[in-house]
Amino acid sequence: MPENSSIPNCCEASGLAARPSWSGSAGARPPVTARAPWVAPMLSTVVVVTTAVDFVGNLLVILSVLRNRKLRNAGNLFVVSLALADLVIALYPYPLILVAIIRDGWVLGEAHCKASAFVMGLSVIGSVFNITAIAINRYCCICHSTTYHRVCSHWYTPIYISLVWLLTLVALVPNFFVGSLEYDPRIYSCTFIQTASTQYTAAVVAIHFLLPMAVVSFCYLRIWVLVLQARRKAKATRKLRLRPSDLRSFLTMFAVFVVFAICWAPLNCIGLAVAINPEAMALQVPEGLFVTSYFLAYFNSCLNAIVYGLLNQNFRREYKRILLAIWNTRRCIQHASKHCLTEERQGPTPPAARATVPVKEGAL
């Protein structure tokens, strides 16, 4: 089948999915397998549910922090930054993936393909770096509380968040030189192609996943040690005194980290295995396992808001307030619309009906 010359290594002229150009590993092309008819509807359902929960959930997180004074602190500014990283993926790449599933291939052109892959990478790496920054922030807050308020105030936190996103952009630049952002028909997505450069894939897994996870693990391990020390002593010293709000925030963000690691570990393990031995592993990885690991990673973007609601009472209460306010506004609009429609159907009240009926003498 001839490829569309205007969209090299992206999609075919007929609109059906074409295999990406596995540059650097010509012999490591995964086998083409026929798919069961239920696969596309199932993946469509996953994308639709993930997009809806991602959009609504992360919007609730952002509004909750902006509305609630108890949540409006320096630490939760990182939470807003993480929510934005998850939200952006629901606004652009996910709808394009849904179109590719429905059309059974990429039909939106090379520009959208590259842009979608870039935004996808921006969201993923931004999430990793924000989770790392949150862990460092919690570590400084709990383990070094005396210096925390000086180095993590409302004035410095926006600078740290800007640095996180600057590092995210810098981390994405090499993709344009390696040529690793292409369409992969197995997952109906324009994304990072693991076999484009085995050395670069190994570096990506190490720098964008293993190293941040090691830093986060160290920070949370130190916090756990401090928490256990504080609980073992009947009267904790000033150094070990923990506020309930700090402990609750730590547990919430630790759960976010665990969920992220579980969702992204399978895909990164596959990437590392392919980078170590591309000729053998690229052929041995089952397509079902690869697709499942990718969509599990996608699904992570909608889980953080759920974790906040389950583990943090302030977020849960603010969710209810926002949803209740939206519901009441909707009911008021519906009531006003029904009232207007009733008046239009009945027509204007005649003057005689509006006139005051005179009271007869002796009626009282």
Swiss-Prot record:
Subcellular location: Cell membrane
Region spans: Disordered: 343-364
Keywords: Cell membrane, Disulfide bond, G-protein coupled receptor, Glycoprotein, Membrane, Receptor, Transducer, Transmembrane, Transmembrane helix
Membrane topology (UniProt): Multi-pass membrane protein
A single BP term in Gene Ontology: circadian rhythm
Cystine connections: C113-C190
UniProt topological domain (Extracellular) ranges: 1-42, 98-115, 177-200, 275-287
Keyword Glycoprotein: yes
Record's keyword annotation contains Transmembrane helix: yes
Glycosylation sites (chain numbering): N4
PROSITE patterns in alphabetical order: G_PROTEIN_RECEP_F1_1, G_PROTEIN_RECEP_F1_2
GO MF terms held by the record: melatonin receptor activity
SMART domains, sorted: 7TM_GPCR_Srsx
Biased composition (Low complexity): 352-364
Matches recorded under Gene3D superfamilies: Rhodopsin 7-helix transmembrane proteins (1.20.1070.10)
Chain ranges passing through the membrane: 43-63, 77-97, 116-136, 156-176, 201-221, 254-274, 288-308
Family annotation (InterPro entries): GPCR_Rhodpsn (IPR000276), GPCR_Rhodpsn_7TM (IPR017452), Melatonin_rcpt (IPR000025)
Cytoplasmic side: 64-76, 137-155, 222-253, 309-364
GO cellular component terms, semicolon-separated: plasma membrane
Role: High affinity receptor for melatonin. The activity of this receptor is mediated by pertussis toxin sensitive G proteins that inhibits adenylate cyclase activity.
PANTHER family associated with the record: B2 BRADYKININ RECEPTOR/ANGIOTENSIN II RECEPTOR, MELATONIN RECEPTOR TYPE 1B
Family statement drawn from the similarity comment of this UniProt entry: Belongs to the G-protein coupled receptor 1 family.
Protein name: Melatonin receptor type 1B
